[in-house]
Amino acid sequence: MKELMIGNAAVARGLYEAGCRYVSSYPGTPSTEITEFAAGYDEVYAEWASNEKVALESAVGASLAGARSFTAMKHVGLNVAADPLFTAAYVGVNAGLVVCVADDPAIHSSQNEQDSRHYAEAAKLPMLEPADSAECLAFTKRAFELSETYDTPVMLRTVTRIAHSQSLVETSERVEPPLRPYVKDAQKYVSMPAVAVKRHVVVEKHIEDLRKYTETCDFNREEMRDPEIGFVTSGAAYQYVREAFPNASVFKIGMVYPLPIERIRAFAAKVDRLYVIEELDPFIETAMRAAGIAIAGGKDRTGLLGELSQYRVRKAMGASLPPTKTLGENLPGRPPVMCAGCPHCGLFTVLSRLKLTVFGDIGCYTLGATPPLNALDTTLCMGASFNMLHGYATVRPEQAKNAVAVLGDSTFIHSGITGVVNTVYNLGVTTMIVLDNAITGMTGHQQNPTTGMTLKNVPAPKIHIEKLCEGAGVPAENIRVVDPNDMAEMTRVLREELAKDAPSVIVSRRPCALLKYVKHGLPVRIDAEKCRGCRACMKLGCPALRFAEGKVWVDEAQCVGCGLCMQTCGFKAIEEGKA
């Protein structure tokens, strides 16, 4: 049956049809929906792991147990999982194991623009790269077969446009292979030096076998048309090339590691001028040049930054550009902002007022760095804020009382706990704030270990942030739970904890305003006669407030009656809503 699917749904369908039994992932745009769609299949066990490293390690365990297993993560998540990834190449598999990584060219929702193809080469793992939803489904199924044939995890790489674009797929029934028996084999699975040195030989043999395989497999194909110009490309870039130059000859790469160098060489001999079109790093181009294949152009034309497009490809080639129509007026800008009623707004307003140095982290709250809040000083990676604050305060102890670190509840579980342990163990004196909004918010409301619910909405033990911190050695009297919508109380508690000569944890606890069970109040009302146009309330960054004609106005369609703006108004011009 033919269906229209986004790439992520097609990957999930592929692992379902391949008989995958076990999926463990951590949410990360643009990969999140793969695991959410997989959870919709009753035959597939799917879970949110505490982080990507845990997810991959769990999937390796499921593979050794004899079940086809899968994990998905965004590109920076693969950094977290890199430790088990490299050794998993040595250990190999029992049943098939597929590791999907979703890159984010143009940095739509990430902190960097890294190219994950390098991981395949560095870890010596085969990597497939689909160019549409149909290939997402087909390549996922084939990846399990490759994994079992060559006794290796197989990587599947997508990018944002493939993950979130729709195209037709042909679905089929699920074929579930029986569980493979687990046989103890210390010479394979126990990766200590004496074993690993032997397994390295096996890894190199597998890669050599895969180099032969990629020269004949149908993941890679030659599309001969006009021989005057030829393109070597893969993934989303293939779609741009085909639309920009429909009459050109193309060598489409589906297995990006190992590359089919000899087939590319043969294709190069058939065209007059050869170009390489790929997003981000010159991964394919570098390999071709190293093999002595003459290239008329590549990254010197397309550049290293951002996404490609049909327009950019034609422009890079010096071709005429299609006519465009200019709108009479530009659309208004829509900068990313926190939602109306967001519990983080109150906290960040307090932090901004106190003029503290604030070490930030990854999540919705990263938006606290933007105007008008301007509350965050740094953002590095998941879980970094507590550790960065520790280093900062150790070097500049006189500033320790004027600095805090913030991270979210899901991020705390992901990689924040170790920061608390490190701070306590190394006699740090810092104030760490956990923003507990009862959900993993930025990636679309996923459950996490602090919510008491699994991915499949099964009740689970609720991990208590306060108890974890106390167990890590933070004095119980220095662990405070505060409602961030009470800005006066938050200010008081912050000052108290900053004054202490011991580590402190403040849990800023209020559920995300978008959660279905959260009850909202009536929209607030503005008394126009009392409003002085001072804009103090506008510093909250609430999208339900706007300033026009010298006064503040409320968008009743957005206002949830949280009352934060009432607390900021010195003229009592903002009142509770009335039915």
Predicted segments with their positions:
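Flexible, low-complexity linker and terminal segments
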Residues: 1-8, 12, 130-338, 343-344, ...
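Thiamine diphosphate
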Residues: 1-133, 161, 224-225, 283-285, 369-507, 517-518, ...
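Short acidic, glycine/serine/threonine-rich loops at helix termini
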Residues: 34-37, 60, 81-85, 107-114, ...
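Short helix-loop-beta junction
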Residues: 37-43, 241-251, 467-475
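Conserved thiamine diphosphate
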Residues: 104-153, 159, 186, 194, ...
